[in-house]
Amino acid sequence: MMPPDIKPRSRDVTDGLEKAAARGMLRAVGMNDDDFAKAQIGVASSWNEITPCNLSLDRLAKAVKEGVFSAGGYPLEFGTISVSDGISMGHQGMHFSLVSREVIADSVETVMQAERLDGSVLLAGCDKSLPGMLMAAARLDLASVFLYAGSILPGRTKLSDGTEHEVTLIDAFEAVGACSRGLMPRADVDAIERAICPGEGACGGMYTANTMASAAEALGMSLPGSAAPPATDRRRDGFARRSGQAVIELLRRGITARDILTKEAFENAIAVVMAFGGSTNAILHLLAIAHEADVTLSLEDFSRIGFKVPHIADVKPFGRHVMFDVDHIGGVPVVMKALLDAGLLHGDCLTVTGQTMAENLASIAPPDPDGQVIRTLHNPIHPTGGITILRGSLAPDGAVVKTAGLDSDVFEGTARVFDGERAALDALKDGTIAKGDVVVIRYEGPKGGPGMREMLAITGAIKGAGLGKDVLLLTDGRFSGGTTGFCVGHIAPEAVEAGPIAFLRDGDRVLLDVVGCSLDVLVDPVEFSSRKKDFIPPAPRYTTGVLAKYVKLVSSATVGAVCG
């Protein structure tokens, strides 16, 4: 049997008389005669200077290229965009966050296809760049390895009352809400602002970036143990070099992304997300990656796995610890080994090491859960996973609630309806949102937003105002991985598609039952149905540019808000 061709595509630009011009161009970037026989590896990086999440990627890309060279390949680095959710939060910029996931996937596909690169190492740090890169890997189905930028170290600050606190980005959003209600002096907000980001790296809690990095490791698309070390830790340079070497070995063995991205691999990723109590954005992103890999994945898979996998990680936003602490006690492999030993993971799934997940875990032999940062399965924080899928008269196609950290399973309250986040923020600032209210923010879905904005500004403000346990928030938009409290998102169908959320009115009674996995409006069905007569959705907010294109293509949140 012939060994796999390690240049399955780049021969299109290096071999034969007709490729003289292409070879001439490649000579100008440093290639010589011997290099034309080597596999060409795209090193795709979302490095930029806009946000600390990606600052380490310039350094890590250099180490990846060293690894590719040492393994006998030739690396060619190229860049793609990244949007900072932390900076774009709470204003018009957040409309562009989720669409950046599609732009990243499309741009990586475009370069890889146009230049006929044989494989890729994909580097990302920000929330949407991680799934964007993994979507590209799944779509292209080449030899691919994913590498995370790493998380930021926790900040520390002293407040005006003399107490010292470990703080993350989310504390700033909550401080704004507290200050607006007179519960915190402005000087303390300033102190928190100056401490939350002490250097490079993604937000430190189990927010979206760290959730997706953990999911990537569980999928088998990144090297075992690579998700948890901080961005500044030089172990990351070692993971980067080994990632460059690994992609060449995958080429030699003929292993491509879809060999790794199986249905069972996605079930492993879901289990790890549930055990960590990770971001609800992981549902959108795993659905989208599965779509690109041609794997059938649905909300029912999240429900099924969530019911049997306990929540065992005491991590922010609901817990006490950050990714730095997870790394200190052994990293993501600690959780994976505990789940594997309990029969909750598929150990036979292939990974980018060329070995199975079980073989990887046996090789690195992670310690048992420490009982503090990571609990044992016999003493979980919650007996089921940290995310619950809801259905009901308000969400016939589904909705998502992050149940990790909730003190109650039932909330019944009175609807306060707002068409967009800004109106809700103004009402909170005015003091007109009260205990027992159900704050409904609609026309924020994938099409209606457009872009399915994250509602961190309002959720942080609600918590900062002391209402985090007393107010239920509903939206057809989505939430930051740092969101806490009674928050239901991804409600589908969305308002602009004439979903039931479009017909809620101030004063309607709404019931959330987490145990029953239901979300209902307590209004006579005949009366509620009568409101649908003559429904006319709002005119599109954007008629030109990328968001106008996005609205024409994007699908429901229930299938990952994918575009085609």
Swiss-Prot record:
InterPro entries, per the entry: DHAD_IlvD/Edd, Dihydro-acid_dehy_C, DihydroxyA_deHydtase, DiOHA_6PGluconate_deHydtase_CS, ILV_EDD_C, ILV_EDD_N, IlvD/EDD_N
CC cofactor: [2Fe-2S] cluster; Mg(2+)
Active site residues per record: S480 (proton acceptor)
SUPFAM superfamilies reported for this sequence: IlvD/EDD N-terminal domain-like (SSF143975), LeuD/IlvD-like (SSF52016)
Residue positions where N6-carboxylysine is found in the record: K128
GO MF, one annotated term: 2 iron, 2 sulfur cluster binding
Intrachain disulfide bonds: none
Subunit architecture: Homodimer.
Family designation: Belongs to the IlvD/Edd family.
Protein name in UniProt: Dihydroxy-acid dehydratase
Protein species of origin: Mycobacterium leprae (strain TN)
Encoding gene per record: ilvD
